[in-house]
Amino acid sequence: MSKWYQGNGKNSDVVLYSKVRLARNLADMPFPNRMSKEIKRSATKKIYATLKSSEVAQEFDVIDLSALSKIKAVSYAEKQLISADFAKQRETSAFMLSKDEDVSIMICEEDHIKINSFAPGQDLDAAYEKADKIDDIFIDNLKIAFSNKLGFLTASPINLGTGLKASFALHLPALAQSNAIYKLSAMVGKLGLSLRPLYQNGNGDIYILSNQISLGITEKGAIDNANAICDQIVKQERGARDQLKDNFEFEDKLYRTLGILKSARRLDTPEFLNSISLVRLGISLGYFDIEYKTIGEMLYTLQNASLIDSAKTPLTEQMCEKLRAEIVREKID
């Protein structure tokens, strides 16, 4: 079965993917940070049983992190399917994952239920539709914590109300080149959203745009607002890219970067992310005949833990760098 990240969507030159997260809690249990291990296990069984008895049961696998290695758990976090903190709590953690990995459901992380739904490109509606379908199953069969005044009750006050977080992963290399990211981030913040790097130190020029307000606004309102801001950022990034088209020195830099990737025998993670970012930019400018989904698949699968997990054998840092370079050469040759 193909994975969701192997597809393309609207505005894929800038928007890698859309993500909707819904946070829900059981009304008759304390928040996870106040749960004993026994109560947490009981809640996990209750939530899992609800989904297993539903019409979508065959679409999901349950992943018991306590039965997995640390590397396997971290590989799920690298793919944004679970949080990094959740991956560290392997002893009492479990989540459910759809067959093509477009929906994950963390159980007893910060909240009792956290539904994450992905769609390629700019398509929050598709991501929300999938998350909402799962949400309805839980609401119809479990007593979910809800206040007529505040909406859905969550462990963090930030998520009160809809419990919805709408996000985009944006590739913004041209805006990053022109040092416009900080100004853009400040502007976005004034509109109730945030813009932050996906990877450490801004490697890869990929930024996450997400709403920061879920109280006093409807799900549709939050999604429409996020889409409107995303549209503006896409327009700005494309404008900045247009200014690079006739820059011979920059064109040379892009081709040199592709040449390095085609011949490199070792690639550490920062060099990989930054080089792939430039190649992806070169694709959008019409220089390279490589599919966006090829880049997306590499971003999704070539970080250290994912490499080690796919190799099915322990790898040193140097071995990861060697294997990463080998796979990149095969993918873009």
Model-derived features: positions:
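Long, Pro/Ser/Thr-rich low-complexity/intrinsically disordered regulatory tracts in eukaryotic proteins
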Residues: 1-149, 164, 178, 182-185, ...
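Conserved phosphate/anionic-ligand binding catalytic regions in large, soluble enzymes, centered on
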Residues: 151-169
